[in-house]
Design a protein with these regions (language model features):
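Unchanged
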Residues: 73-158, 166, 170
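Residues embedded in well-ordered beta-strands
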Residues: 44-46, 54-56, 115-117
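Short secondary-structure boundary/capping segments
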Residues: 17, 46-47, 58, 125-128
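Conserved Nudix-box catalytic region and its N-terminal flanking loop in Nudix hydrolases
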Residues: 48-89
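Conserved beta-strand segments that form the floor/walls of ligand-binding pockets within enzyme
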Residues: 27, 67, 115
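A generic fold-level signal
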Residues: 1, 40, 50, 108-111, ...
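Short, Lys/Arg-enriched, disordered terminal segments
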Residues: 1-3, 164-171
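Acidic, metal-coordinating catalytic segment for phosphate/diphosphate chemistry
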Residues: 2-45
């Protein structure tokens, strides 16, 4: 994504060297300020029961593959609240503990994805209409059933092994 005009005043931006960044950054000569690129921020969650021996995976958008629960962070909302909100909205589950796992920038959607563990107090799911299907898996089954070559798969593998490696993925 490229930024050509100042979001404050509309002036065409020029590239100017930024000493601290050590590289050229878009600069507005009218506002006398650098303009850093804007990107989306979202959360994805490894939703587990309290024993952390079961993992909830979902299917969405007519796709026939399991992924993690995820959603965008609203303006003014912190990431941890977004985790709780998304799990409650999509699955009607009460989150009792939130733990940060790892982050990864996903260029395809210009999104910084923040991955968390969301521990819930019940496995009694009441999904909303955004969810096509869901299933609780054992840790081993979850690793086998999550979408291959996906950010969800990479985050889940990292959660299970403690080592995060990201491949070129389709989504």
């Amino acid at each position: 994504m490229e930024m050509n005009y100042c979001m404050q005043c509309g002036t065409k931006l020029v590239m100017k060297y930024h000493e601290t960044e050590g590289k050229d950054i878009p600069y507005c000569s009218t506002c006398s300020d650098y303009r850093f690129l804007v990107f989306n921020t979202a959360v994805s969650m490894v939703v587990t029961n309290q024993a952390e021996d079961r993992i909830l995976l979902i299917k969405q958008y007519g796709r026939d593959r399991y992924i993690l629960v995820a959603g965008y962070i609203n303006k003014g909302e912190d990431a941890e609240h977004a985790v709780i909100r998304e799990v409650e909205e999509e699955m009607n589950l009460h989150v009792v503990n939130v733990r940060f796992n790892h982050s990864h920038y996903f260029a395809k959607s210009n999104t910084l994805m923040l991955n968390y563990t969301a521990i819930v107090d019940s496995m009694d799911v009441h999904e909303n209409d955004e969810i096509d299907a869901y299933r609780w898996f054992s840790r081993e089954e979850a690793a086998k059933n999550v979408a291959r070559h996906s950010l969800a798969g990479d985050f889940l593998k990292g959660y299970l092994t403690g080592e995060y490696h990201f491949s070129d993925m389709e989504n």
